[in-house]
Amino acid sequence: MPTVLKAAAVLDVDKGRVVPDGFVLVAGETIQSWGNRTDLPSVPPDTAVLSFPRQTLIPGLINSHAHLCVPSGGQPFYLKQSDEMALLTAVRNMRRELLSGVTTVRDCGDQNGVLFALRKAVNLAILDGPRFILCGPPLTMTGGHAHFLGGVADGPAEIARMVRRRIAEGADFIKLIGTGGGTPDTHPAHASYSRQELAAAVSAAHRLDVPVTVHCRGTPGIVNALEAGVDQIEHA
């Protein structure tokens, strides 16, 4: 059964304008039409109608760099938590994202792959949630930034194997840690993975048409990432 959403206005992001007296017509998971209510097509008499007389309807927002497993409230994210707590934290944060208008989340590093299960639960309609773009635990060197998340790999051969494993688990992209970060005993200005190690990851991922992004907060790591041919750099 279709549903009509009526609101004070609808945001037209293509033309950069606000359409007054707006509507959005939805059938299942598809937006069939939208615009000013004078353009509302004929619908069956039993069509559900939801009214938002003071609100403006906007397209779903995209959070392009999230960490749903990270606790909030001032708790340092590097304090090791169980996978069960990481998953429960992600469920809470996922709900907050959805209620704030975010309908797509690109998560840039979870703990031991718990978000793969969460995405499956959402896809099976067990839970309400956004669309997910996932990488699983980021790959990092022994003792490197975010090492506690479960993605430690050293040397080109081991890194390439880990890349293939991540993709088999369901990763949409590969994330590597190219410099230190907020983890104790790491330094944001210091490179972690070498250019050769990053290049091994890029080669393995690109062979399977999967993009690669790298956490870099210092120039040496950025240079390594660029020379290795990565697709994206986070934080630079």
Language-model segments: residues:
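Divalent metal-dependent hydrolysis catalytic cores, especially in the metallo-beta-lactamase
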Residues: 89-115, 129-140, 171-184, 211, ...
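Histidine-centered divalent metal-coordination motifs
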Residues: 7, 65-69, 215, 235
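Metal-associated gating/positioning segment near the N- to mid-region
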Residues: 55-124, 196, 221, 228
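Alpha-helical scaffolding segments of alpha/beta enzyme cores, especially the outer helices
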Residues: 117-120, 158-161, 165, 196-203, ...
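Active-site core of metal-dependent hydrolases
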Residues: 184-236
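Histidine-rich, glycine-flanked metal-binding segment
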Residues: 2-4, 10, 14-58
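N-terminal small/glycine-rich loop or linker at the start of catalytic domains
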Residues: 60-76, 130-151, 198-199
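Active-site mouth loops of central-metabolism enzymes
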Residues: 75-88, 144-161, 190, 211-213
